[in-house]
Amino acid sequence: IVPGTDAILSVGGDGTFLSASKRVADSGVPILGVNMGRLGFLSENNPEEVVDALLSGNYGIEDRTMLHSVISGAEPCGTEDYWPYALNEVTVHRSGASVLGINVTVDGDELPTYWADGLIVATSSGSTAYSLSAGGPICSPASRVLIIEPISPHNLNVRPLVVPETAVIDISVKSRDDSVICTMDNRTMSLPSSASLRVSMAQFSLKRIRLSRSSFVKALVSKLFWGEDIRNNGEK
């Protein structure tokens, strides 16, 4: 980031915004997402409304929590730009056909082993991304929490777990395969199944510009059709 930069414009979709978050990192420079992609939940703003809103001061800056991950017992393979932070989520996923046995501890307390395709650790920002598709809760971006969400668990009693921002989450797996897939937002890498992963809240937050006419609830309704009931012709 060039010194003196006031803001970063991320022009594209949410994937572009995630890539921009890596570039901005802990610089404190805010990001404004301009939607030229598909869904545009993080990049929710239409190009024609951005300039007027910025010039008139009709915007605010919100903090978005980030995840920090530490890999033990292996070096990540498959990515040349390894960066241990994520805005949405960190995941561990099986690389083959066999289900994983996933051992998780939260601040040293062991959870029951998850027998599943994988595991998601998400921020409140990530609660409307992969975690949502896996059945996780929706959390306001102002909520400084972590979501632990198994992917396709082979257990009817498993539910997502929400833990506080101070939690330290340790993950290890039992696998018949030699490797597992680890993702951090839109970055993918391969890890040996003997590796372990520690995930916690990062010490810095991402600054995101939100236009005044927008809100988290409005984005849920307009982008994800939250609460819409087609039986009543979309009436609220």
How does the language model describe each region?
Residues 39-117:
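Catalytic core of DAGKc-family lipid kinases
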Residues 104, 126, 182:
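Short aromatic-centered micro-motifs
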Residues 14-16, 39, 125-127:
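Short glycine-rich anion-binding loops that position phosphate/pyrophosphate groups of nucleotides
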Residues 19, 23-34, 41:
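Gly/Ser-rich helix-loop-strand patches that form or flank binding pockets
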Residues 1-5:
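Short acidic low-complexity segments
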